[in-house]
C-alpha cells in the first residue's frame, strides 16, 4: 500500500449534516514521509432546505475573517464534490482520509459525497464505490496514543505550536487543515510512550 494522507478540515453552520450545511472545507495531501503533495479548498452554497444553528452562527461570527472566507463566492455543492472526487482520485497513491476528530469532519464529507456523487467516503460492507481506502485516521486518537495523554486533553490549544507547524488555528479551513497536516507529520515521527528506540 502506498498511502496518501488526505488531512481535512470543514466549516459548518450547525452540527448536523443535512439539517445544516457545510460552508467550506480544505484538504492537504501528504505522502508517508509527511511531505505535502497538494491541497484542495472550496466554499459551498448552503443546502436549500437546510437551516442554520444560531449558537454555531454566533460562535462563527466571532471570527470575522474565517466567516468571510467560508461564505464568500460559494460554488454549488455538486460541482465542488465532483471536483473533490477527481482531485482525490488523481493523487499518487491510495487516499486515506484523516481529520481531527474523524467522527465530525468525516460524517460531513461522507454525507456530501453520498448526496452529490453517490459514493461513500470510507470502505465497509456497503454497496457502491468508496473514495478513500481503509476506515480513516482520527488525529485526536493518534495524538492520545502517541503522547499517552488523556483523549480529552488532545485538542488544538494543548499542542505545542511547533506540532502544528506554527500555523494559527484560525478556523479558515485551509489554515486548520494545514495545521492538522503538520500535526500528523509530527505524530508519524513520534514514538509512543514505552516503545523501544
Tell me what each language-model feature is.
Residues 2-6, 11-102:
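Conserved non-catalytic scaffold segment of RNase H-like nuclease domains
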Residues 10-12, 106, 139, 177:
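Generic detector of well-ordered alpha-helical packing
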Residues 22-26, 113-117, 191:
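Glycine-rich, phosphate-binding/catalytic loops in enzymes
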Residues 42-45, 123-143:
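A short, structured active-site edge motif that brings together acidic residues
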Residues 46-49, 57, 136-177:
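Active-site-proximal helix-loop-helix substrate-binding element of RNase H-like nuclease domains
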Residues 77-84, 105-112, 135-139:
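Amphipathic alpha-helical interface surfaces
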Residues 96-102, 107-108, 154-197:
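Acidic, Mg2+-coordinating catalytic module of metal-dependent nucleases/exonucleases
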Residues 103-134:
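Substrate-recognition/cap helix-loop segment adjacent to the acidic, metal-dependent catalytic center
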